[in-house]
Amino acid sequence: MAVQRTFSIIKPDAVAKNVIGKITTRFEEAGLKIVASKIKQLSKAEAEGFYAEHSARGFFGDLVAFMTSGPVVVQVLEGENAIALNRELMGATNPKEAAPGTIRADFAESIDANAVHGSDSEAAAAREIAYFFAATEVTTR
């Protein structure tokens, strides 16, 4: 297995519930290292740009409104098979379908307010990391 980097967002619903530390602990206990992290309030333009691939879909406006409704935590996670591992930790997009013990099963309310985002491929991870972090902001641990 190769060491990979993946991108993670702890979304406004989870930040509002004050579970940033609990979610971060899940990443670290699974062997992922946090190599970049910042908390920020997304602007409408940032959210629209990040989710541009969904711009033609009916839920786009609601997604942008949700992602700008409060602060988020954007992170770069690093570890063996990081992309697949993070997706396993997150659980299914719909928390009602997420396996018990996953982040979404434990902390998410709905398919819209589903606590976390994670890259789904190496190409997406590279694009998403670069969207929020300069290369100089990502460390090696």
Curated annotation (Swiss-Prot):
Its cofactor is Mg(2+). GO terms for biological process: CTP biosynthetic process; GTP biosynthetic process; UTP biosynthetic process. It is found in: Cytoplasm. It holds the Pfam family NDK. The active site is at residue 117. It catalyses: a 2'-deoxyribonucleoside 5'-diphosphate + ATP = a 2'-deoxyribonucleoside 5'-triphosphate + ADP; a ribonucleoside 5'-diphosphate + ATP = a ribonucleoside 5'-triphosphate + ADP. ATP binds at residues 11, 59, 87, 93, 104, 114. This is Nucleoside diphosphate kinase. The gene is ndk.
